[in-house]
């Protein structure tokens, strides 16, 4: 499985010194939202971010934050 940092490396401030880490975040499914889509007159989809490892959309952003903290030599993160 391609990890989030690897997949979006050209969009993130990732260098060769940035550790590529993952807790299995990302790759959440798109679900068609038929009822709301019909009301809005569009084809509408939503992401199931609750299926990330911690059940939160924050997993995506935190993997980059933790990788950059590790790159900077941080011993801990609060």
What are these regions (language model features)?
Residues 1-78:
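PLP-dependent amino-acid enzyme catalytic core
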């Amino acid at each position: 499985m391609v990890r989030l940092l690897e997949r979006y490396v050209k969009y993130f401030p990732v260098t060769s010194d940035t550790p590529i880490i993952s807790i299995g975040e990302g790759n959440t499914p798109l679900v068609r939202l038929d009822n709301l889509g019909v009301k809005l007159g569009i084809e509408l989809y939503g992401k199931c971010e609750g299926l990330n490892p911690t059940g939160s959309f924050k997993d995506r952003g935190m993997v980059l934050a933790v990788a950059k903290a590790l790159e900077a030599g941080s011993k801990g993160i609060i």
